[in-house]
Amino acid sequence: MGLSDGEWQLVLNVWGKVEGDLAGHGQEVLIKLFKNHPETLEKFDKFKHLKSEDEMKGSEDLKKHGNTVLTALGGILKKKGQHAAEIQPLAQSHATKHKIPIKYLEFISEAIIQVLQSKHPGDFGADAQGAMSKALELFRNDIAAKYKELGFQG
């Protein structure tokens, strides 16, 4: 299920574009997640009160959290699958503290793909989309394995 060197290159090429505005991309990803899957908003006490897209766009806290999410994901992607050290604390906090189901990680993966498609169509063609999907699936599978070790049925 690993990615080829060429696939990792496609992932990291588009990720370079994301890093030019992590907070903006992250905010868009979270807004897309909350719009497509409103139930996910319930896991975020800090954002539950944000009812409209305009409120979400105006939230500095949402922007900061988007930056945090994509900074962590970027660190994981740059490890090209050798991300056990990065995954462990993330799985621990998402399983024991936040109680985030794996399904929600699938939802945010979809949101990431959609935001990249809309913001970077020239750098995110079918090959890059396929590579990013594989990279995000690898991440989710490894988080799910850690969840299982922790006894979390997410």
Curated annotation (Swiss-Prot):
O2 binds at residue 65. One of its GO terms (molecular function) is oxygen binding. It is found in: Cytoplasm, Sarcoplasm. The modification Phosphothreonine is found at residue 68. It is an enzyme of class 1 (oxidoreductase). It comes from the Eukaryota. Nitrite binds at residue 65. It catalyses: Fe(III)-heme b-[protein] + nitric oxide + H2O = Fe(II)-heme b-[protein] + nitrite + 2 H(+); H2O2 + AH2 = A + 2 H2O. One of its GO terms (biological process) is removal of superoxide radicals. Residues 2-148 form the Globin domain. Heme b binds at residue 94. GO terms for cellular component: extracellular exosome; sarcoplasm. PANTHER family: MYOGLOBIN. Belongs to the globin family. Monomeric heme protein which primary function is to store oxygen and facilitate its diffusion within muscle tissues. Reversibly binds oxygen through a pentacoordinated heme iron and enables its timely and efficient release as needed during periods of heightened demand. Depending on the oxidative conditions of tissues and cells, and in addition to its ability to bind oxygen, it also has a nitrite reductase activity whereby it regulates the production of bioactive nitric oxide. This is Myoglobin. The lineage of its organism: Eukaryota, Metazoa, Chordata, Craniata, Vertebrata. The gene is MB.
